[in-house]
Amino acid sequence: MGLEKSLFLFSLLVLVLGWVQPSLGVESRETPAQKFERQHMDEEGPFPSSPTYCNEMMKSRGMTSGWCKSMNTFVHEPLATVQAICSQGQVTCKNGRNNCHKSSSTLRITDCRLKGSSKYPNCDYTTTNSQKHIIIACEGNPLVPVHFDDSV
């Protein structure tokens, strides 16, 4: 009888997981490189001129679903330019790992910072454009960007 109960509970668990898995968002099926592209790449044109750029981008890229991400940076350069940073100067990441690389030249970026009074679901961001070196973590073979670490 104990075996039958265990078998029933296991079958029920498999059934529930089968229902839950398809309902998970795109984010759960992304590779780290795809997540980096979704969260940080915006190759379109020059610096954004709209003061609501960050509000629009953070929402459209899925970074305000269930909570407001406090800070994010978008890079306005071709993906190939950012991928090439993985073969440039290696530096230590903020978390102490040694898989970060610093761009040899400055890149066009936009920082999105959550305003202090902003609360989910009304995520409100300040938009700041600048030109800085970026530091990204790279993994894989070939190396590809998987994490935006900093801008300097």
Curated annotation (Swiss-Prot):
<feature type="binding site">
    <location>
        <begin position="69"/>
        <end position="73"/>
    </location>
    <ligand>
        <name>substrate</name>
    </ligand>
</feature>
<feature type="binding site">
    <location>
        <position position="94"/>
    </location>
    <ligand>
        <name>substrate</name>
    </ligand>
</feature>
<keyword id="KW-0540">Nuclease</keyword>
<dbReference type="GO" id="GO:0016829">
    <property type="term" value="F:lyase activity"/>
</dbReference>
<feature type="active site" description="Proton donor">
    <location>
        <position position="147"/>
    </location>
</feature>
<feature type="disulfide bond">
    <location>
        <begin position="86"/>
        <end position="138"/>
    </location>
</feature>
<feature type="active site" description="Proton acceptor">
    <location>
        <position position="40"/>
    </location>
</feature>
<dbReference type="GO" id="GO:0004522">
    <property type="term" value="F:ribonuclease A activity"/>
</dbReference>
<dbReference type="InterPro" id="IPR001427">
    <property type="entry name" value="RNaseA"/>
</dbReference>
<protein>
    <recommendedName>
        <fullName>Ribonuclease pancreatic gamma-type</fullName>
        <ecNumber>4.6.1.18</ecNumber>
    </recommendedName>
</protein>
<keyword id="KW-0964">Secreted</keyword>
<feature type="signal peptide">
    <location>
        <begin position="1"/>
        <end position="25"/>
    </location>
</feature>
<comment type="similarity">
    <text>Belongs to the pancreatic ribonuclease family.</text>
</comment>
<keyword id="KW-0255">Endonuclease</keyword>
<feature type="disulfide bond">
    <location>
        <begin position="54"/>
        <end position="112"/>
    </location>
</feature>
<feature type="binding site">
    <location>
        <position position="35"/>
    </location>
    <ligand>
        <name>substrate</name>
    </ligand>
</feature>
<dbReference type="GO" id="GO:0004540">
    <property type="term" value="F:RNA nuclease activity"/>
</dbReference>
<dbReference type="Pfam" id="PF00074">
    <property type="entry name" value="RnaseA"/>
</dbReference>
<feature type="binding site">
    <location>
        <position position="38"/>
    </location>
    <ligand>
        <name>substrate</name>
    </ligand>
</feature>
<dbReference type="InterPro" id="IPR036816">
    <property type="entry name" value="RNaseA-like_dom_sf"/>
</dbReference>
<dbReference type="InterPro" id="IPR023411">
    <property type="entry name" value="RNaseA_AS"/>
</dbReference>
<keyword id="KW-1015">Disulfide bond</keyword>
<dbReference type="GO" id="GO:0003676">
    <property type="term" value="F:nucleic acid binding"/>
</dbReference>
<keyword id="KW-0456">Lyase</keyword>
<feature type="disulfide bond">
    <location>
        <begin position="68"/>
        <end position="123"/>
    </location>
</feature>
<comment type="function">
    <text>Endonuclease that catalyzes the cleavage of RNA on the 3' side of pyrimidine nucleotides. Acts on single-stranded and double-stranded RNA.</text>
</comment>
<dbReference type="InterPro" id="IPR023412">
    <property type="entry name" value="RNaseA_domain"/>
</dbReference>
<keyword id="KW-0378">Hydrolase</keyword>
<dbReference type="GO" id="GO:0050830">
    <property type="term" value="P:defense response to Gram-positive bacterium"/>
</dbReference>
<feature type="disulfide bond">
    <location>
        <begin position="93"/>
        <end position="100"/>
    </location>
</feature>
<keyword id="KW-0732">Signal</keyword>
<feature type="binding site">
    <location>
        <position position="113"/>
    </location>
    <ligand>
        <name>substrate</name>
    </ligand>
</feature>
<dbReference type="GO" id="GO:0005576">
    <property type="term" value="C:extracellular region"/>
</dbReference>
<comment type="subunit">
    <text>Monomer.</text>
</comment>
